[in-house]
Amino acid sequence: MNEDQFPKAYDPKSSETGVYSFWERSGMFVANASSEKPAYSIVMPPPNVTGILHMGHALVNTLQDTLIRYKRMQGFEVCWVPGTDHAGIATQTVVERHLKASLGKRRTDFSREEFLKHVWDWKEKSQNVILSQLRQLGCSCDWSRQRFTMDPGANRAVKKAFKILFDKGVIYRGYYLVNWDPILQTALADDEVEYEERDGWLYYIRYQVVNSEEFITVATTRPETLLGDTAIAVSPEDQRYSHLIGAKVVVPFVNREIPIIGDFSVDASFGTGAVKITPAHDKDDYKTGMNHQLPMINILTPTGEINENGGIFTGLSREVARENIITSLEALGLFVKKEAYSSRVGVSYRSGAIIEPYLSKQWFVSVDSFRDSLREFVNSEEIRIFPPEFVRNYLTWVNNLKDWCISRQLWWGHRIPVWHNKHDENVICFDGEGGPEEVMRDPESWYQDPDVLDTWFSSGLWPLTCFGWPDEDSLDLKKFYPTAVLVTGHDILFFWVTRMVLMCSAMVDTEPFSDVFLHGLIFGKSYREYDEKGEWFYVSGERKRDYDKGKALPKNVVAKWEKLSKSKGNVIDPIEMIEAYGADAVRLTLCSCANRGEQIDLDYRLFEEYKNFINKLWNGARFIFGHISELTSRDLEEGVNQDLLGLEDFYILDRFNELLDLIDGHYNCYSFDKIASLAYDFFKNDLCSTYLEIIKPTLFGKQGSDQQRATKRKLLATLLINILGVLHPIVPYITETLFQKLKATLGTVENGKGDSVTGHAVSMLRSEACMVAEYPKPIHVAFPQGLRESFGIAERLVYTIRNIRGEMQLDPREPLQAFVISSEKKELVDVCIPIMCALGGVKTVEQLAEAPKDSIFSLGVVEGIQVGVILPPEHLAKERVRLEKEKTRLEKSIDSVSKLLASEDFRTRANPSLVQAKKDSLRNSQRELQSILDKLASL
């Protein structure tokens, strides 16, 4: 074969760019909203424009592209909309850091417009990198429909949705205790707060009762908030304090008199049984304050410092104020003690700041009216969640859903479309261009709300905005909405998935997608090295890479699977992996890992393994090309003579049909790991290691007729075309490269359609590309009765020969002489002999009536068929040992099955077919044992 036509080694770098350009140039990614084909649509979870793609993006987009390519080949009008997310808090934070590092300036050194220009510039650069990386990965998105969560269409949709909910009274504004990030200086939704168990202190503080010598002691983890105390609460059933209910105490430093109240929410066993109530800085206290109509005093600034309500502590940070207050309380004799105490602390998922419960006026979405529909979509399976164990998580979250704080104190994001009157409480919600008429007439009297919307508000509308909503006449909206499936990580089930269901159903009264597949989160292997003192640090650099590749770990180094993190040194860059191993190997690795669990352990060695498979695919195809180079498409159009098909041919066709059936089922439930494993095993084991090895003697003219050789070649071409189609959704680059080589080799398809064996392959060759070819279908032939059983016997005969070779320590390169004894299955043995020769490394196999008396041989039995391998004289002792081991195994098996069959309970209760199977098994084992005993006697 010409090296230029088909190089010995596959080079991903030299082919991937050209192949992708061919697809894109040919318009194969573009969806047609006017098509009569059934629609299949996906909207890409938009990557944040904060930087570049990470391995999680590579995973989710590989899985989506696999589905899109599969459905495209199945004849659907597929539409995969790519896009990026403005990611309000995250992007603003990144840009602020960038400006600080590059210009030495803070956000507040710019006007709002100037700062936003910097953010838009950042967005353009980041987005261009992200989209380029998606192309490298092989994503077959419809780039003509590319969206951004702050593009004009998205902005129009956001304003429309806000006004719809505002007019219904679902969106409201009010004072509420929000999760405040003092670093980012914005409110966060409840599910944007992560909770950590942290060690701290429980402080005991005394308050003096007014007009009394008595004191009441409380226990608190936050003594600095006493500046905002508006009550002391005790349980009405606590006899220690019942006489004090209704009395007042003095708050130290601010000299405010506050009541002692009775409230059943107080746990009398906690601390002293008395608790301070600070409604403006604690969620439980806020509820108590509302129930008792207590004043709410905010003591903090947006940056987390004590405000003017803090008296002498004004201007101090929370931490410094705490220390100073404790010192001052000690001086006043009001500090009792402190005890070690562990508590859950809320932390910002973005900045890492300790969250401050903060009384603030914010915009909210009332969720009460949505709770029933959110449950019903999933309970009725209008939306199916995979894996199904996440249904419980979803429903639990919906049942505990709280009003959603949607306003953020940022500059980057969708401005809230509300204008406030400077002179009264009037507000106008406006979703058009420009501003409301009233504002246009008297701009000096109005101002637009300075806050922006939570990123998840616009992301919640993503499936709608991608297809043109609120334009209800949009062809895309009519054709492609709702979408088929949402593929995303289980960690944003609540952040995003549920909010999409809420927002989209609120706008158009239908679910945004039919299925949700939640993949696991990627974990990488990190290595902790311990020193003599027991302190440890993360291993990085070359040493880490050596460990990743399998180098033995020293005793003081411990490996651990952890979430990907730069600080842990376990981040895996998908683009680096593509450069090193090729996009197909990366995609196959990710699909093979995409299990339905919560954690994906991504081992570096997997990339190497699947790169080897890509090379195996190339080499296997190259071998096949060497034997079909004289074929033309016309030969395939003529079909094959099924009378010339052998057991091995029927076997591989049956295995292929079984592969299609299994893969289809796994696609339906998003078992990507099983799809990858099945396709991998079929090509590597069934096609290459088994079928190709069996037919090599025929291909090389060592056995069989010219007609049989021609049939094998047609079948090889047919199988290669079809398996390329099966593999294409997962490994598109190499399959497209090989498909184009097949088209060039076999030539233009004429008018013939082929037969039931070659027909679909002929149909695929008519396609411009593998990507748009029809997905393979089962190959129909008259399969012989008992095919699987017959080939199974052939495989077991081969296994027996290989086992004898191994146990006798015979040279694996030495061709063996074998014989078979079977009075009842001579025809089956005749069919099996070529397979035994090809796969068992046997030179000749003779059918005999009895074992040769003048030879030393090793004997095995399969289904009553005795198979023997002639041995050199020096192997006599080894054969005796082997037979004794086999005799022991069979005796144990016979004893076990005999006891089972002797049980009347088993015979009467078990399925009759199972009882018969056990009887047959016993009979075969007894027959095999007798053969072993005869052989031992002869030795």
From Swiss-Prot:
* Coiled-coil features, chain-numbered ranges: 874-939
Which residues does the annotation say bind ATP?
K566
List the InterPro entries: aa-tRNA-synth_I_CS, aa-tRNA-synth_Ia, Anticodon_Ia_Val, M/V/L/I-tRNA-synth_anticd-bd, Rossmann-like_a/b/a_fold, tRNA-bd_arm, tRNAsynth_Ia_anticodon-bd, Val-tRNA_synth_C_sf
Free-text domain note: ValRS has two distinct active sites: one for aminoacylation and one for editing. The misactivated threonine is translocated from the active site to the editing site.
Chain positions of motif 'HIGH' region:
47-57
Entry keywords, A to Z = Aminoacyl-tRNA synthetase, ATP-binding, Coiled coil, Cytoplasm, Ligase, Nucleotide-binding, Protein biosynthesis
Q: Where is this motif: 'KMSKS' region?
A: 563-567
Q: Source organism's superkingdom?
A: Bacteria
Q: Which gene encodes it?
A: valS
What is its quaternary makeup?
Monomer.
A molecular function annotated in GO for this UniProt entry is: valine-tRNA ligase activity
PANTHER family named in the record? VALINE--TRNA LIGASE, CHLOROPLASTIC_MITOCHONDRIAL 2, VALYL-TRNA SYNTHETASES
Q: Which GO terms describe its biological process?
A: valyl-tRNA aminoacylation
- The scientific name of the source species is Chlamydia trachomatis serovar L2b (strain UCH-1/proctitis)
> Which cell locations does it reside in?
Cytoplasm
Cellular component, GO annotation:
cytosol
Q: What does this protein do?
A: Catalyzes the attachment of valine to tRNA(Val). As ValRS can inadvertently accommodate and process structurally similar amino acids such as threonine, to avoid such errors, it has a 'posttransfer' editing activity that hydrolyzes mischarged Thr-tRNA(Val) in a tRNA-dependent manner.
What name does UniProt use for this protein? Valine--tRNA ligase
What family is this protein classified in? Answer: Belongs to the class-I aminoacyl-tRNA synthetase family. ValS type 1 subfamily.
